[in-house]
Amino acid sequence: MNAKEIAKKIMDSSHVGTMATVEANKPFSRYMTFYHEDFTLYTATSKKTEKVDELEKNPNTHILLGYNDEGYGDAYLEIAGTVTISDEVRLKKKIWNEHMKPWFDGPEDPNLVILKVSPDAIRVMNKKGESPETITF
């Protein structure tokens, strides 16, 4: 498989990853649940979070996704991207699932926003002894 095929396979099977933002020149990471179309990632959050404040100031993010098996040599992705914050109801309905109910009243909840991550580069790591490979967009 080539790097794009490996990345797509990891994105299809891995939904929980870390998302980093920057505040006062310091990185902050948190676990997020991701959905994707092609190589664009989407994740839901409340517009009242620190991460939204941070992304409004600096839309750059770094995401780790994958590393699901034993933890030794598992392939994973390092994704550098730019975030767009959307409150578009069509997109919220598309991303909505029942797991979001504890935090939101539904896809039309005014506090729900979708973070759209457009990748600048995806680095495929730990490919069974092969060197990392970077996909640029």
Question: Regions from the language model: what does each represent?
Answer:
Residues S13-T18, I95-H99:
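Short Pro/Gly-enriched beta-strand edge/turn motifs at strand-loop
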Residues N2-K4, K48-T49, E98-M100:
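Charged, amphipathic alpha-helical segments
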Residues M1-G17, T136-F137:
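Extreme N-terminal tail/first-helix region
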